[in-house]
């Protein structure tokens, strides 16, 4: 069987196994008997402040539990205007992704419209993580029963029209595969040049992957789309998987704190039920929530401690390195390769992990 056919036939179970290898490796921070790391115990009171400027955003998401928690974080910001949420296949199929986004926004008291986007990837392959997030993407906890329906119209057209009507004002916060964004760039390249910035939760950063040893799931799900986005010339900030390890992971005690809040906190805690089971079954007592961390990078300037300009290239050829994103760091001298690229991304290299959970907790109360 050739590699392309093999990738197209990959099962959810196989993907879950691939996810596990990296996720659990990232979660191997030594913990106390209560499951809380020493660093988390000593920095429990740390928080950072959200942006004080008015922000116009479109959130593009493949809504699973982690995406929903990020939507809630954004919806609770006083200075953030969510112009719309565009959804696509990724963690779950398009219909589930749509319902999950509607449910999260409804609970958070946000009436931003939700637009359906891509039900497929650019190359026709579909990979999802049902075995990680549950069949409904929200922990199979009976949380998804939205009263509203998706807005009329296509997500890609909504992105293009909104950017056109708000030139140099709209930030795209991309929490899943880049399919909707790539289609918008292909369809209206001139209009999309008016995007203020793209914030992407994607790539392995400078660390290991979770879909494969070198690839992160959001890129792996549609590498061709991610390459189009990277090559577009639009201003992009990337938050990689490597930012989500150690103290940035959530413990059982922290999730219990969320559940005690009732309302949005309880919703988030319950939606993480299946992924907590998945992590525990594979030897980890903490869980990643990369999407909320990426949202915090976008909306809380003080949360990001350091960045580096890079040239990022995405490998789209079939093989072991499929969907790996390679970063050439500005100012770094390589022994052989000449580092004279046009730098197309800002890569986040350090965040205030110790403030992550408490900032999230304060925001959604």
Task: Briefly describe each language-model feature range.
Residues 114, 229, 295:
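A residue-level signal for conserved active-site and pocket-lining positions in enzyme catalytic cores
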Residues 104, 108-115:
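A glycine-rich helix N-cap at a beta->alpha junction
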Residues 21-25:
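C-terminal motif of bacterial Sec signal peptides marking the signal peptidase cleavage site
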Residues 2-14:
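Bacterial N-terminal signal peptides that target proteins for export
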Residues 50-55, 73-82, 220, 224, ...:
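Conformational coupling and interaction surfaces
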Residues 29-54:
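N-terminal, intrinsically disordered, polar/charged segments of Gram-positive cell-envelope systems
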Residues 50-61, 65-103, 136, 142-245:
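Active-site histidine-anchored catalytic micro-motif
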Residues 115-146:
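Surface-exposed loop and adjacent secondary-structure segments within mature catalytic domains
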């Amino acid at each position: 069987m050739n590699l392309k056919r093999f990738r197209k036939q990959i099962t959810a179970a196989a993907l879950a196994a691939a996810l596990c290898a990296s996720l659990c490796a990232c979660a191997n921070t030594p913990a106390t008997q209560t499951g809380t790391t020493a660093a988390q115990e000593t920095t429990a009171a740390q928080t950072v402040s959200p942006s004080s400027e008015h922000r116009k955003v479109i959130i593009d998401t493949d809504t699973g539990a982690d995406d929903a928690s990020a939507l809630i974080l954004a919806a609770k910001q006083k200075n953030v205007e969510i112009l719309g949420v565009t959804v696509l296949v990724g963690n779950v199929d398009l219909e589930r992704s749509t319902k999950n986004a509607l449910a999260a926004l409804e609970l958070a008291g946000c009436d931003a419209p939700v637009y359906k986007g891509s039900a497929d990837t650019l190359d026709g392959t579909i990979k999802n993580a049902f075995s990680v997030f549950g069949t409904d993407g929200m922990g199979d906890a009976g949380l998804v029963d939205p009263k509203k329906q998706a807005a009329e119209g296509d997500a890609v057209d909504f992105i293009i029209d909104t950017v056109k009507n708000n030139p140099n004002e709209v930030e795209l916060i991309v929490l899943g595969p880049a399919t909707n964004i790539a289609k918008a760039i292909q369809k209206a390249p001139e209009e999309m040049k008016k995007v203020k910035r793209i914030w992407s939760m994607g790539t392995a950063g400078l660390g290991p992957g979770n879909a494969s040893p070198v690839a992160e799931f959001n890129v792996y799900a549609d590498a061709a789309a991610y390459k189009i986005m990277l090559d577009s010339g639009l201003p992009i900030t990337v938050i990689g998987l490597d930012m989500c390890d150690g103290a940035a992971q959530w413990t059982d005690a922290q999730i219990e704190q969320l559940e005690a809040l009732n309302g949005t906190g309880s919703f988030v805690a319950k939606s993480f039920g299946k992924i907590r089971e998945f992590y525990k079954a594979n030897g980890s007592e903490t869980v990643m929530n990369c999407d909320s961390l990426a949202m915090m990078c976008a909306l809380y300037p003080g949360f990001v401690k350091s960045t580096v300009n890079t040239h990022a290239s995405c490998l789209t050829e079939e093989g072991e390195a499929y969907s790996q994103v390679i970063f050439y760091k500005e100012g770094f001298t390589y022994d052989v390769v000449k580092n004279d690229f046009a730098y197309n991304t800002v890569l986040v290299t350090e965040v205030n992990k110790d403030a992550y959970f408490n900032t999230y907790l304060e925001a959604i109360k």
